Amino acid sequence: MSKRRIAPLTFLRRLLLRILAALAVFWGGGIALFSVVPVPFSAVMAERQISAWLGGEFGYVAHSDWVSMADISPWMGLAVIAAEDQKFPEHWGFDVPAIEKALAHNERNESRIRGASTLSQQTAKNLFLWDGRSWVRKGLEAGLTLGIETVWSKKRILTVYLNIAEFGDGIFGVEAAAQRYFHKPASRLSVSEAALLAAVLPNPLRYKANAPSGYVRSRQAWIMRQMRQLGGESFMTRNQLN
């Protein structure tokens, strides 16, 4: 009887290990491939596309127009760093002090959860994973972040991030956002336009770059101040990000 009870557990354990091994190979291959090849599609794009189809929106198309860092305004990279991850050039994927502050805040304010994800973590999540806050997903995100930080340069991480970030419903990547909201290529974005796009990133389905609320305008102004404090364009050059 004991053998019959153990056998199914053993089978499930082996199956789980094989699935994890297959995912590790898949994700590892993706990290290696996308270190040099433009990203055609991300997990977030796939999730949005499937949700649209299930909702009967068959005309919905989630895609991004890939552009190199040379074709992105330096203000855009600086804006997302100022808004999301000011220690981006320094850390290895995780901002430990920011994580500790977020945990302390969340313990005191359970109704208003604060995140502390770096640009590297957001890139790993957007590229390979699904939305959610489970410990399983967080664990996978941590592993993928370490992989990306090990294989990719900081400039590559920032390039991929800007090309797959969601800036509105169905608007992925800075080139699509620049064309949609400002009718110009990403290379010509101004300081204020870059800051406005960065201002909607915490929740691009709620905050609108084409109809900014008072909060978004306030956040845009704060981001512009942070960009100046970081040193402007010299920050990007100094850290070899442009």
From Swiss-Prot:
Signal peptide: none
Catalysed reaction equations from the record: [GlcNAc-(1->4)-Mur2Ac(oyl-L-Ala-gamma-D-Glu-L-Lys-D-Ala-D-Ala)](n)-di-trans,octa-cis-undecaprenyl diphosphate + beta-D-GlcNAc-(1->4)-Mur2Ac(oyl-L-Ala-gamma-D-Glu-L-Lys-D-Ala-D-Ala)-di-trans,octa-cis-undecaprenyl diphosphate = [GlcNAc-(1->4)-Mur2Ac(oyl-L-Ala-gamma-D-Glu-L-Lys-D-Ala-D-Ala)](n+1)-di-trans,octa-cis-undecaprenyl diphosphate + di-trans,octa-cis-undecaprenyl diphosphate + H(+)
Keyword Disulfide bond: no
InterPro entries for this protein: Glyco_trans_51 (IPR001264), Lysozyme-like_dom_sf (IPR023346), PBP_transglycosylase (IPR036950), Pep_trsgly (IPR011812)
EC number: 2.4.99.28
Gene3D superfamilies in UniProt: Biosynthetic peptidoglycan transglycosylase-like
Enzyme superclass (EC): transferase
Molecular function via GO: pentosyltransferase activity; peptidoglycan glycosyltransferase activity
Transmembrane segments: 19-39
Keyword Cell membrane carried by entry: yes
Subcellular localization: Cell inner membrane
Pathway where this protein functions: Cell wall biogenesis; peptidoglycan biosynthesis
GO cellular component, one term: peptidoglycan-based cell wall
Biological process annotations from GO: cell wall organization; peptidoglycan biosynthetic process; regulation of cell shape
Record keywords, A-Z: Cell inner membrane, Cell membrane, Cell shape, Cell wall biogenesis/degradation, Glycosyltransferase, Membrane, Peptidoglycan synthesis, Transferase, Transmembrane, Transmembrane helix
Main location: membrane
Membrane topology: Single-pass membrane protein
Classification via HAMAP family: PGT_MtgA
Known function: Peptidoglycan polymerase that catalyzes glycan chain elongation from lipid-linked precursors.
PANTHER family: BIOSYNTHETIC PEPTIDOGLYCAN TRANSGLYCOSYLASE, MONOFUNCTIONAL BIOSYNTHETIC PEPTIDOGLYCAN TRANSGLYCOSYLASE
Family that this chain belongs to: Belongs to the glycosyltransferase 51 family.
Protein name: Biosynthetic peptidoglycan transglycosylase
Annotated gene: mtgA
